[in-house]
Design a protein with these regions (language model features):
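Short, low-complexity N-terminal leaders and the immediately following helix N-cap/first helix
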Residues: 1-85
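Solvent-exposed alpha-helices and their adjacent loops that cap or buttress functional pockets
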Residues: 9, 13, 42, 80-83, ...
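Residue-level recognition of short, solvent-exposed, well-ordered loop/turn junctions
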Residues: 28, 34, 121-128, 258
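Generic secondary-structure signature for well-ordered alpha-helical cores
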Residues: 43-47, 70-77, 128-131, 137, ...
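Flexible, glycine/charged-enriched surface loops at secondary-structure junctions
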Residues: 50-52, 77-83, 142-144, 198-202, ...
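Extended, charged alpha/beta regions that create polyanion-binding interfaces
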Residues: 55-163
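Phosphate-binding glycine-rich loops and their immediate beta-loop-alpha structural context
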Residues: 138-224
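Short glycine/threonine-rich loop/turn motifs
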Residues: 200-327
Length: 327
């Protein structure tokens, strides 16, 4: 691509690099100039105009952006096209979790500085039609060879992991005779609804190992959540022991995400079980969101995945927290 100033009469067929205000009309940057346009520029006293002119083997920015967007989009991600000014936004076809291949995204962005892809962070919960990324071709034209290499590098880099579960049961425990406020249940219902999961009728039991075990055995949801009246402080505390007594297993206790440290993860009768930290009573983002989203969408969540959550795991502190970090 050639770029630079030329006399207006020499700019026919070139791409205008900067918008020009001619009084009675405005020529927007990116416009392919016609004879009428260049005559108007000359009549307005412009001696030179900055343009871009594609050379053999170059692709226009919009063509390049459309091709890249089509290559990047995997299952459940679609380009919102066609391109305008070298940009195509990518959107989710439904609720779920963004699965991004960081190696492919990086490889695409290293092909040519003029070819770029920006995305949301991997594993972000998505709503239907939410923007997950944007392709931007920075220059007005780019070598077709670079576009082909970027297409190959970024092939299928983004996809949507859709929910694979439809129902959940939340088991709450109480200390004493009083039923706990429904703040935690409301927060969890909203999280589940964002992924299309429904919550079964309320279950509140005594904060006791046997009571938790019985509730687990009776739970109807494909996913079981436990929110205890007293925080789980050890892998052998009330809720994890209740899970074992129900015939289940505990795969993980604790996570390097704050708020959210006191989460545990296990299974019973082939169903995932998440022991929620107290911060899950707040709608604010916490570590339980990251685990819940992946579990609901059928993505692996084990010790390796949870350990990796520590990078970026210092989240905004919940206003509901009893003891702030600074204390």
């Amino acid at each position: 691509m050639r770029f630079g100033p030329v006399p207006p009469r020499a700019a026919v067929g070139a791409i205008l690099a900067h918008s020009e205000d001619l009084g009675d009309r405005r020529l927007r940057k990116g416009k392919r100039l016609t004879e009428e346009d260049t005559a108007a520029l000359a009549a307005a006293g412009r001696r030179q105009v900055v343009v871009a002119r594609l050379e053999p083997g170059d692709l226009h920015e919009d063509t390049a952006a459309d091709r890249l967007a089509a290559a990047i989009c995997g299952d459940g991600i679609a380009p919102q096209g066609p391109s305008a000014t070298g940009r195509v936004n990518l959107r989710a076809a439904g609720p779920g979790v963004l699965v991004a291949d960081s190696a492919r995204v990086g490889a695409l962005n290293r092909v040519d500085p003029m070819l770029t892809l920006a995305t949301l962070p991997p594993f972000r919960r998505l709503a239907a039609s939410e923007m997950v990324g944007t392709v931007k071709v920075i220059s007005y034209g780019v070598a077709a060879d670079s576009v082909a290499r970027a297409e190959a590098a970024g092939q299928g880099a983004l996809r949507l992991a859709r929910p694979v579960l439809a129902t959940a049961t939340l088991i709450e425990t109480r200390v004493g005779p009083d039923t706990p406020p429904d703040k935690g249940r409301r927060a969890m219902r909203a999280r589940l609804a964002a992924l299309g999961l429904s919550l079964s009728p309320r279950v509140v039991v005594a904060h006791d190992t046997d009571a938790v075990a019985e509730a687990l055995a009776a739970a109807q949801g494909e996913l079981v959540l436990i929110l205890t009246a007293s925080a789980t402080s050890d892998i052998h505390d009330t809720a994890p022991e209740g899970l074992r007594r129900a015939g289940g297993t505990v795969a993980q206790f604790g996570m390097p995400v704050d708020p959210g440290n006191l989460l545990f993860l296990g299974a019973v009768s082939g169903r995932p079980v998440i022991g929620l930290p107290g911060c899950a009573r707040s709608p604010a983002l916490n570590g339980a969101d990251w685990v819940l989203d992946r579990v609901a969408c059928g993505l692996p969540v084990g010790p390796e995945e949870i350990a990796a959550m520590g990078l970026g795991g210092l989240l905004k502190e919940s206003p509901a927290r009893g003891r702030p970090r600074a204390d």
